[in-house]
Amino acid sequence: MKKLNNPAILVVDMLNDFVTGALACDRGKAIVPAMAQLLDAAREKGVPVIFCNDAHIAGVDRELALWGDHALAGTKGAEVIPELNVSSKDFIVPKRRYSGFFQTDLDILLRELGVQSVVMTGLHTHMCVRHTSADA
């Protein structure tokens, strides 16, 4: 297997509201143990772990009209699930749209960390993971 150059792990929307809450995804629960192992291994090797998460503004974000209230900034639903053990060395990038790159600090963070390869994981691959991948 080819070695990745300056990798980072990018975790998209592994939030309480998407795993067990307002927009729960039963299949999402199944990937949690393997994802937790991946993140622990990355941290042990010094690979940056970045969480890119929905953080909507109630009554403002248009997406809420489509999907209902979910991942409202500052609520428990917008927090990363506890099983992924967010570390003080991890990075959290809030987003208000499907793409983690649209009007966020994700691009500059990756550049400043010197990241050249990104391993993506997360929930709703047909939505936020897909849009973030396309914009990368």
Q: Each PLM stretch: what is its role?
A:
Residues 43, 95-97, 130:
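Basic side chains
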Residues 1-91:
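Active-site acidic carboxylates
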Residues 81-123:
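Internal catalytic-core helix/loop-beta-alpha segment
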Residues 58-59, 100-101, 127:
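Active-site environment of divalent metal-dependent phosphoester hydrolases
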Residues 123-129:
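Phosphate/ribose-phosphate-bearing ligand recognition and processing surfaces
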Residues 35-38, 106, 132:
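Hydrophobic residues within alpha-helices
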Residues 129-136:
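Short Gly/Thr/Asp-enriched flexible loops that form oxyanion-binding sites at enzyme active sites
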